[in-house]
Structures are given as C-alpha cells and as structure tokens.
C-alpha cells in the first residue's frame, strides 16, 4: 500500500507539472482520478513495456477524455512517457494532446473526447476479445457527469446483452462537471441502482483508499 501511495503522489506531481506547463487542462478531474489510475496501472492491469504494442494484454479506455493530465501522469510514472514529455502537454506539435490520441502514444488504447463514446468503444473491445478468445480484460473510466449522455446507457445495455464479464467500468463520482454540480445540472444519482438495473455487478468504494 505504501508503494501505491508513493506512485500516486508522483502521479499527482506529474498532473500539476503538465497543467502548469500547458497553462491549461483539467486538473480537478485528473486529481480525483489519480488514485484509481495508479491502482489500475500498478496493481491490476497486465500492461508493461514488453507487451504494450501487442494485443496480448489488458486495455484501458479513458472515456472522460478531458482528464489527460491524469492519464499522462500515470503513464509517465509507469515509464511509458518521460518527464520531458510531461513538460510538453498541450504544446504545439506535442504528442501529449488535450485529449488522448492513440496514434501518438503506444499505451493509449483509444482516442476519446466526446463523452459517452469511450465506454461504447470499450464495449466493442470487450466483445472483440470474447469473439477472439482473448482472456484479457477491458477497463474504462468515466465520469458521473458523463452519465448524462444517452450513449453511456446504450453501451451499458449492450454490455449486459452480450454478457461482457471481461469488462469493468469505473465511475469517478466527484459530483462536478464544467457547468456546476452534477446534481444541479442533471441529476444522475443513484448510479449504483441504475447500473444494477442494466445488469451490472456494482461495487461502491472510496476512490482514494487503497485498502
């Protein structure tokens, strides 16, 4: 646990360096997801330098694509990006764009940005693994504000229909979106009951507690 905490601290440092260097970005959502991303990349997912370019590994989709400082922060801590790369966030010609681009970074599995599309892509990737007999898992991180998008629920319905038990979604419930509090803009809660209604097995957890 102490090692994970140290990684998470470094990820947060990378987030702040990226946002400061680019003088733009979304630090709030990146910081609220830092521990989840750290846990995924250092404790859960099968992804490392030797398999990052292949298909024989777990895959991650950042559906809330605007929090790239968080994704780049953990990729740098994992060794897929350098500290020098972090300093180029949102600079002209940089591969570290404001939204993730799978054409520029090997460890980025899906280009995202339009909310709701990432989880739909994750469903397709999980279904493809099923059809190919690939036992590796697909993980996706989405936001609670993102759950206002109808495409999220179409994807949830498809995941249940196809029995995608190789798919894991994580919802960052920080209760905030760009227009204000989620409950005030368009209340999506209780999310656990909604996802259970779509056939998901739901686990509620504190996203900042590695225990």
Region locations from a protein language model:
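Thiamine diphosphate
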Residues: 5, 91-103, 121, 125-127, ...
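Short amphipathic alpha-helical interaction patches enriched in hydrophobic/aromatic residues
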Residues: 19-23, 75, 199-202
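N-terminal capping segment at the start of a domain
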Residues: 8-24, 172-174
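Non-catalytic, mobile gating and regulatory segments of ester bond hydrolases
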Residues: 1-3
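Conserved short-loop catalytic and cofactor-binding motifs
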Residues: 24, 59, 143, 179, ...
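Cofactor-binding active-site loop characterized by glycine-rich and histidine/acidic residues
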Residues: 15-18, 30-161
